[in-house]
């Protein structure tokens, strides 16, 4: 399998997102990379499913709460930016204060 660097990045985000999802299911609080991967993977999948940038910007704020991440993690992530592929091209999705 010959993947481009962008495809490798997406695969890494997706894999890390799955690890984070499994840890959440077990009740484990997420650390910084896990929280970033969890939200980023959900945004990439939402774009692939046809959601708009505005919908994803809102959706990104509903994925994790402070109770689901380690202490101090919410403050470490003031925003998340993901370059996602939509049906009409690639766009930057920015989610402000993703962990409420």
Swiss-Prot record:
Give the molecular function GO annotations.
Answer: nickel cation binding; urease activity
Q: Known CDD domains for this protein?
A: Urease_gamma (cd00390)
Where it mainly occurs, coarsely classed, is: cytoplasm
Q: Which UniProt keywords apply?
A: Cytoplasm, Hydrolase
- UniProt pathway: Nitrogen metabolism; urea degradation; CO(2) and NH(3) from urea (urease route): step 1/1
EC annotation from Swiss-Prot or TrEMBL: 3.5.1.5
TM spans (from-to): none
Going by the record, the broad EC class of this enzyme is hydrolase
The protein's location, in the record's own words, is: Cytoplasm
Give the InterPro entries listed for this entry: Urease_gamma, Urease_gamma/gamma-beta_su, Urease_gamma_sf, Urease_subunit
Catalytic activity, as annotated: urea + 2 H2O + H(+) = hydrogencarbonate + 2 NH4(+)
Q: Does the keyword Hydrolase apply?
A: yes
Q: What GO cellular-component annotations does this UniProt entry give?
A: cytoplasm
Task: Please name the GO terms of the biological process aspect recorded for this protein, alphabetically.
Answer: urea catabolic process
State whether it acts alone or in a complex, and with which partners, per the record.
Heterotrimer of UreA (gamma), UreB (beta) and UreC (alpha) subunits. Three heterotrimers associate to form the active enzyme.
Protein family per UniProt? Belongs to the urease gamma subunit family.
Against PANTHER family, the record matches this protein to: UREASE
List the protein's name: Urease subunit gamma
State the species of origin: Pseudomonas savastanoi pv. phaseolicola (strain 1448A / Race 6) (Pseudomonas syringae pv. phaseolicola (strain 1448A / Race 6))
Q: Which gene name does the record give?
A: ureA
């Amino acid at each position: 399998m010959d993947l481009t660097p962008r495809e490798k990045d997406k695969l890494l985000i997706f894999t890390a997102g799955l690890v984070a999802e499994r840890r959440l299911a077990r009740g484990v609080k997420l650390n910084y990379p896990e929280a970033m991967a969890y939200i980023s993977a959900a945004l990439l999948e939402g774009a692939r499913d046809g959601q708009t940038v505005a919908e994803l910007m809102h959706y990104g704020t509903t994925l994790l709460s402070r109770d689901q991440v380690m202490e101090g993690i919410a403050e470490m992530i003031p925003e998340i930016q993901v370059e996602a592929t939509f049906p009409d091209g690639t766009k930057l999705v920015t989610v402000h204060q993703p962990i409420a």
